[in-house]
Regions:
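Beta-strand-dominated extracellular/periplasmic modules and repeats
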Residues: 1-192
């Protein structure tokens, strides 16, 4: 038997993969999709669906979010009034069979960019999935911040159609933000 044939017949060996083998360390996060506790003032849900270029749900994706708190400060920032027990700043949710995800959070406050320019309240979103060799990065902006959105340095660089793909829509318990990977209504992604 050749070495190659032996590798395919010996139980317990990891099969070769394009980007593998799979290493799941730290995939489940401690807080999962809960950026804030349920009792946190202003707690809301950001829910959505991830769709491929044909409009089909992506059932095995991972949505990660990072954001500032309502005061515009990130978790771990110095300050006496930050409650690190109830605000984590990070959420992670696997998409279900219908491509849906949900993150419990609060609406973030505006933050300053590295060059000091005030940015509109937003949530950073990373998306990982089978078939993607690199993660996709986008942002969620809020429809009730028209003045801040009109001045946001990143949003103003985009054409009006791309800009609309980054603005969530209000829902009964928070906001809805669908992520479209390709096609006519493709979400704007950033290459950073």
């Amino acid at each position: 038997m050749t070495e190659r044939a032996e590798a395919t017949t010996v139980p317990g060996r990891t099969p070769s993969q394009t980007i593998g083998p799979f290493f799941g360390f730290a995939l489940p996060s401690e807080t999962g999709p809960l950026v804030v506790d349920a009792a946190a003032p202003g707690a809301l849900w950001v829910r959505g669906q991830v769709l491929d270029g044909a409009g089909e749900p992506v059932p095995d994706g991972l949505v990660e979010t990072w954001q500032a708190d309502p005061s515009g400060r990130y978790a771990g920032s110095r300050g006496l009034d930050q409650d690190s027990r109830s605000f984590h700043g990070f959420g992670r949710c696997a998409t279900d069979a219908a491509g849906r995800y949900a993150i419990r959070t609060v609406k973030p406050g505006p933050v300053r960019s590295l060059d000091g320019v005030l940015q509109a309240p937003h949530i950073e979103v990373l998306f990982f999935a089978r078939g993607l060799l690199k993660r996709l990065l986008t942002r969620i902006y809020f429809p009730d911040e028209p003045t801040a959105n009109a001045r946001d340095p990143l949003l103003t660089m985009l054409d009006p159609r791309a800009r609309t793909t980054l603005v969530a829509t209000p829902s009964e318990d928070g906001y809805r933000f669908d992520i479209r990977l390709q096609g006519e209504h493709e979400t704007a992604f950033f290459d950073v």
